[in-house]
């Protein structure tokens, strides 16, 4: 076995951070790489690694006139998405992981990982990737170091985080960092030929909350391998936030400016496929209103000296789902992708560009699909994988707000929760207080089956849109949200809204056009925040009063508007009856306040 001292590169460490150096030495001795590289995040490093990946067959450079400095990658067909069944929260006690997470005894998991990681980087380079989540120098930001044997991960981390020398400088000689180890699990024996996308059929995405560690094995795919994203920014950060009195949330952040120049910053949590990125890059249809982007996926929020919640976007890039992103659905996302992008599992055009379903109304006559096969419009399978991705600097988005990198963060005025609901849930409902808002967040759901008329389809709960991402017991997470409200000045807390863009008629027709028209709902929210709209009380919460939602130029019938802006008490009685089954999942750890909210809702519906 090679000792760490014999591995080239360890002695070239550009840091005196004792804990970091000891950890890198320990992982090097375990994984046995051929060499160690300390990543500086420079352009020359990026150019060298992309050239290496092109030579390996992992990347294909796209036409430089059509997509400057952009690349295409196709993954192994077995490695295309987050692997929730292989994702573990290894807290000291099983009950601290809770019923919504996979748990394994941490000692048992460490034994498994020790065996898997032993020698797993043989024949490969071990890259040490220091990174900052959030703007450099911000008190809301936090640091991490990822060790990986994937140059694809290194170039992606350069886009998604503030990576390299600036992060290492901020770490200093004794700063806190989250250690994150990643391996493809594909050691190369001497003389063996590498494959374009190395991975392993055995996969573990493991988090140790108490020690703030992340270990990921077997996958090269984004969410499993870019450990700053969901693993750190949500799963580990949610535990840090619980312990330190802040919030790490699966939320977009947008800046809304009224025609009068009044600004509000709004955070919003939606499960996947519910329009989060589209709302983050909203183009308002309402004249005079302006929407700008602060973040499209994750928000870290801490209290400022003035008692308000301030948010930063911890990411530096966008890691978006390509299919369905097009000129009609999200033109700002398309404009963002002009260059400096890596596309994974999309299709390639004959002229050196990329394409995916939804990018353009017309399909190209011929493509190379994500599996490398010829594709025509007559092909039976999609040209791009449904979870095909793009990685691109957020700074290229034409709607980025100037405040998006403000180290102080932005003050949040309102928080929206929403799912994909064909029935029951109105277009917008304001919670009269923080506790009701937490109740709304705790019952967020999407319908997975169509409903019969006057009934509710099968629901998939995704509380706070955090179901796959909460790093501890979700009942304790609800309690943490309630505690955040208890210790704050109620007048300075963001107001909470429950929204639903996806209501349908009994015939299955969408009642609300969504997309840019959602600016009308945001305008009503702003008018509530400014004390202008009075709203109307309902058993659920406060809805727009007749005439308050701006409808000029809106192609929605009066009857549909009435459905969208009312609470059907009979349907909501059915809805309320479904909540205990969800709450009982959490046993006696569920906060009593949420049961009280449920009981009060039932009384109001029957009153």
Swiss-Prot record:
The active site is at 274. GTP binds at residues 273-278, 389, 420, 515-518. This is Phosphoenolpyruvate carboxykinase [GTP]. InterPro entries: PEP_carboxykin_GTP_CS, PEP_carboxykinase_C, PEP_carboxykinase_GTP, PEP_carboxykinase_GTP_C, PEP_carboxykinase_GTP_N, PEP_carboxykinase_N. Monomer. Substrate binds at residues 82, 221-223, 272, 387-389. Binds 1 Mn(2+) ion per subunit. It comes from Parafrankia sp. (strain EAN1pec).
